[in-house]
């Protein structure tokens, strides 16, 4: 295989990525990784041992280099062949082919599985026999409890708030009696004294 763009250059100075790019450009179609590696090896004249040593780095460089694109199934092509919008379509299209081969599962509805067996089926549209029960007796009991609760509150209605106010005005002579009351005039005097000292 001859690559015209490398005429006059030493093959030992060429990188595997440069050669792979030139091979894909000349080939014009996607290639499997193994075929691409074999083509690079045959062009550079490298031994199997030398290629095996550099194989992992070559694969990493293919992934990192922005000019290559993996199309799935270890097929590689040049990114320049695919416009930006069609990249996802080209990559995803191979997955769609595999999905068509698989038979689709049938959906099972758990409620309709045994439609012929009516013993276990609950019909929620039927009237419930408890709906016909008379609940008027329960309403009478609620009325009685309301009357007893209101009678408890009636006892509190006679309590007057004025009795508490008188008790609050007369304080026992404890700690409160020992406190002195401050007047506004006393506060002003303290501030005036501080102002005089700072001058």
UniProtKB/Swiss-Prot annotation:
GO terms for cellular component: DNA-directed RNA polymerase complex. PROSITE patterns: HTH_HARE. GO terms for molecular function: DNA-directed RNA polymerase activity. Residues 116-199 are annotated as: Disordered. Keywords: DNA-directed RNA polymerase, Nucleotidyltransferase, Transcription, Transferase. Residues 116-147, 157-171, 182-199 have a biased composition (Acidic residues). It comes from the Bacteria. One of its GO terms (biological process) is regulation of DNA-templated transcription. The keyword Transferase applies. Participates in both the initiation and recycling phases of transcription. In the presence of the delta subunit, RNAP displays an increased specificity of transcription, a decreased affinity for nucleic acids, and an increased efficiency of RNA synthesis because of enhanced recycling. Belongs to the RpoE family. This is Probable DNA-directed RNA polymerase subunit delta. The gene is rpoE.
């Amino acid at each position: 295989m001859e690559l015209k763009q490398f005429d006059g250059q030493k093959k030992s100075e060429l990188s595997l990525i440069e050669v792979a790019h030139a091979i894909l450009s000349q080939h014009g179609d996607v290639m499997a990784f193994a075929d691409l590696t074999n083509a690079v090896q045959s062009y550079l004249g490298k031994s199997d041992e030398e290629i095996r040593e550099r194989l992992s780095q070559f694969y990493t460089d293919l992934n990192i280099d922005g000019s290559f694109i993996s199309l799935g199934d270890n097929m590689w092509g040049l990114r320049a062949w695919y416009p930006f919008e069609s990249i996802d379509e080209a990559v995803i299209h191979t997955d769609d082919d595999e999905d068509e081969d698989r038979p689709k599962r049938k959906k099972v509805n758990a409620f309709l599985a045994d439609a012929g067996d009516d013993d276990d089926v609950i019909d929620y549209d039927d009237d419930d026999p408890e709906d016909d029960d008379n609940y008027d007796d329960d309403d009478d009991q609620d009325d009685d409890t309301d009357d007893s609760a209101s009678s408890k509150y009636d006892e509190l209605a006679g309590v007057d708030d004025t009795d508490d106010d008188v008790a609050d005005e007369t304080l026992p002579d404890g700690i409160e009696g020992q406190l002195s009351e401050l007047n506004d005039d006393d506060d002003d005097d303290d501030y005036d004294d501080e102002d005089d000292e700072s001058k």
